[in-house]
């Protein structure tokens, strides 16, 4: 196996994890999604060398999307290198139909990782659940912020690349997804690979300018960096602060909702009517999300908030989620559509 040096990169991640002990708990099984690119190889090098200090068990997973002719060779070479390093690697291969686009490929990867993590949970002796780890960086966070900003989004979208979250949005009790490298830039992961003498496999699809993220990475961000050096890291920090503001807002909104709950799991309408439009809309959105309504567009939410507001008659709306929102003088209620 490779030697285990202690460089300033190790010290930086080690100290970060000591400050956040629940991020990658001591003694847990870590399942690292390994593409073979510089980010995931850098994270592998750091986790491999730090595992004896945190008593982790390290498992690796690689997904072959088959997007370019050499992808099978990358999988083979990566598996050979991992075997030489005594690192356990599972390789999954998709079909063109399963990963026809970015969103489909991401869904396939997370589904495969979730299934493998659950298998590891059943077989590992650790009392901690298996944690899925990916190598997203501050650079990825800046790109995501720009994409979401240009598409049009809310606070949740601007702070969407979080350091820790459930792997599957609909399975809060399932495996968790953790991104330990969000404080590192892509330039730093390249330096880590060089300093640790790690091989890197390049994916030609990362240079495809038909992909939105690649255009932002290769064309837009270099211009912004030339104008304001270090802007990628500052945008990543802004995304983190936005996610914290969003969490704080949700906590305060939840407290407010508790005070206006009505019998039958509804809401008291008079307190909602007494609010200004913005806080009323925020409370209504959170209440609907908690009850499974997640597909409302901004204009629909605005219309619903206005309809239940002051000086408006009783009424109802049928939502695309299959729910029926109805309100009378004193309460607002949400039911499944008959």
Across the structure, where does each feature detected by a protein language model lie?
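Short helix-capping/linker segments at secondary-structure and domain boundaries
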Residues: 54, 226-230, 289-296
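Residue-level recognition of alpha-helical structural elements
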Residues: 101, 128, 231-234, 297
């Amino acid at each position: 196996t490779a030697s285990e040096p202690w460089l300033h990169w190790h010290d930086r991640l080690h100290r970060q994890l000591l400050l956040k002990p629940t991020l990658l708990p001591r003694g847990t099984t870590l399942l690292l999604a390994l593409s073979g690119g510089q980010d995931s190889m850098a994270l592998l090098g750091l986790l491999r060398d730090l595992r004896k200090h945190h008593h982790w068990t390290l498992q690796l997973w690689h997904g072959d999307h088959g997007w370019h002719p050499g992808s099978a060779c990358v999988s083979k070479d990566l598996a050979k290198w991992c075997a030489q390093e005594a690192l356990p690697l599972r390789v999954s291969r998709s079909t063109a139909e399963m990963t026809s686009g970015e969103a489909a490929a991401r869904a396939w990867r997370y589904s495969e990782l979730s299934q493998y993590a659950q298998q590891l949970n059943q077989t590992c002796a650790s009392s901690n659940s298996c944690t899925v780890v990916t190598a997203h960086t501050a650079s990825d966070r800046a790109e995501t912020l720009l994409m979401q900003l240009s598409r049009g989004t809310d606070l949740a979208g601007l702070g969407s690349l979080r350091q820790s979250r459930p792997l599957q949005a609909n399975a809060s009790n399932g495996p968790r997804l953790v991104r330990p490298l969000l404080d590192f830039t892509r330039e730093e992961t390249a330096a880590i690979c060089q300093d640790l003498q790690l091989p890197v496999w390049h994916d030609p699809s990362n240079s495809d300018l038909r992909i939105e993220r690649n255009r932002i990475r290769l064309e837009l961000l270099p211009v912004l960096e030339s104008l304001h050096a270090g802007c990628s890291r500052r945008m990543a920090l802004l995304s983190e602060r936005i996610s914290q503001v969003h969490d704080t807002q949700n906590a305060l909104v939840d407290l407010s909702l508790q005070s206006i709950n009505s019998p039958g799991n509804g809401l008291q309408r008079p307190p909602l009517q007494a609010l200004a439009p913005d806080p009323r809309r925020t409370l209504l959105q959170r209440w609907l999300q908690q009850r499974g309504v997640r597909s409302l567009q901004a204009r629909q939410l605005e219309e619903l908030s206005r309809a239940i507001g002051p000086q408006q008659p009783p009424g109802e709306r049928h939502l695309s989620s299959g729910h029926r929102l109805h309100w009378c003088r004193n309460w607002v209620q949400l039911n499944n559509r008959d």
